[in-house]
Swiss-Prot record:
Residue ranges occupied by any HTH LytTR-type domain in the UniProt entry: 142-246
One MF term in the entry's GO annotations: phosphorelay response regulator activity
Broad class of the protein's primary localization: cytoplasm
Coiled coil spans: none
Function: Member of the two-component regulatory system LytS/LytT that probably regulates genes involved in cell wall metabolism.
Organism, as annotated: Bacillus anthracis
Tree of life domain: Bacteria
Keywords: Cytoplasm, DNA-binding, Phosphoprotein, Transcription, Transcription regulation, Two-component regulatory system
Lineage start: Bacteria, Bacillati, Bacillota, Bacilli, Bacillales
4-aspartylphosphate, modified sites: D54
UniProt-recorded name of the protein: Sensory transduction protein LytT
Length: 246
C-alpha cells in the first residue's frame, strides 16, 4: 500500500480526494493537513510515499512545502492537486510527479498512481544496474552465462562484444564465447571508460584498437591487437573520433 498525505485548506476537497484515493484500494491515507505548519509536522511524523498538495493554502502556498521536500534525502513524490492551471511550469521546476486539476477525476488519479509506481520501478532497476556495474568494475571480471554454466572473463582481455551469425559473441584475446546475455545487458555491465558501442551490433574495447581503416560511405573498420576486424557504422564514427581525439 502506498502511504499518502493530503494537504488542502478546504475540507470538502480533502474529503473528495481521500475518497477517490481509497477507492483505488492501493493507498493508505496516513494523514491530512490544511496548512504548511501542520503539513510539515505530518511529513516528519509519518513519512509518506506521496503528498497530494494544494497550491493555495490558508497560511502560505504549496510551493513552500515542495521546496522543503526537495532538500530532503529521500523525499516523497509531490502531486499538485489544485484548481489553478497556471502553475504547471513552476511545479515542473520543483520536480513534481504530477499536476492534477480540480474537480478530481478518479481515472486521472489512477493514472497518477501508475506513474508513481512506474517511476519507482525505474529507480530500482537503475540502482540494480549501477550496483551490478560497480561489482563488475571491482572484480575486473565479467560473468558470462554460457550454456548451463557461468564463465568469469577478465574484462581487460575482452576485444569486442558483437552479434556474429545471429549470436551474441564475446571475443577475448584467447577465446571466443557465445553468451545468453544480450548486447544491451553487456553494454551496461562493461566499464564505459574502456568499451564503446561502435555499431548497432558491436561494442569494442578501445584499448585493443591498433588501427582505424576507412571503409566505404563514411564507415570504418577497427583493426584490433589480436587481428580481429570490428565494423564502425556512420552513426557511431563521430563519437569514436571524438573519444580518440582524431
Amino acid at each position: 500500500m502506498l502511504k499518502v498525505l493530503v494537504v488542502d485548506d478546504e475540507m470538502l476537497a480533502r474529503d473528495e480526494l481521500k475518497y477517490l484515493l481509497e477507492r483505488t484500494k492501493e493507498v493508505e491515507i496516513i494523514g491530512e493537513a490544511d496548512c504548511v505548519e501542520d503539513a510539515l509536522e505530518e511529513l516528519m511524523k509519518n513519512k509518506p510515499d506521496i503528498v497530494f498538495l494544494d497550491i493555495q493554502l490558508s497560511d502560505d502556498n504549496g510551493f513552500e512545502i515542495a521546496n522543503i521536500l526537495k532538500k530532503m534525502k529521500n523525499p516523497p513524490a509531490i502531486v499538485f492537486a489544485t484548481a489553478y492551471d497556471q502553475y504547471a511550469l513552476q511545479a515542473f521546476e520543483v520536480d513534481a510527479l504530477d499536476y492534477i486539476l480540480k474537480p478530481f477525476d478518479e481515472e486521472r488519479i489512477v493514472q497518477t498512481l501508475k506513474k508513481y509506481k512506474k517511476q519507482k520501478q525505474s529507480q530500482i532497476e537503475m540502482k540494480q544496474e549501477i550496483k551490478g556495474a560497480d561489482v563488475t568494475a571491482e572484480m575486473h571480471k565479467l560473468a558470462l552465462p554460457i550454456e548451463e554454466s557461468i564463465v568469469l572473463v577478465n574484462i581487460e582481455d575482452i576485444v569486442y562484444v558483437g552479434l556474429v551469425d545471429g549470436k551474441v559473441t564475446v571475443k577475448t584475446v584467447r577465446e571466443t564465447y557465445v553468451t545468453h546475455d544480450t548486447l544491451v545487458i553487456l553494454e551496461k555491465k562493461l566499464p564505459q571508460a574502456s568499451f564503446m558501442r561502435v555499431h548497432r551490433s558491436f561494442i569494442a574495447n578501445i584499448n585493443h584498437i591498433t588501427e582505424i581503416q576507412p571503409w566505404f560511405n563514411s564507415t570504418y573498420n577497427l583493426i584490433m591487437k589480436e587481428g580481429s576486424k570490428v565494423p564502425v557504422s556512420r552513426t557511431y564514427a563521430k563519437e569514436l573520433k571524438k573519444l580518440l581525439r582524431i
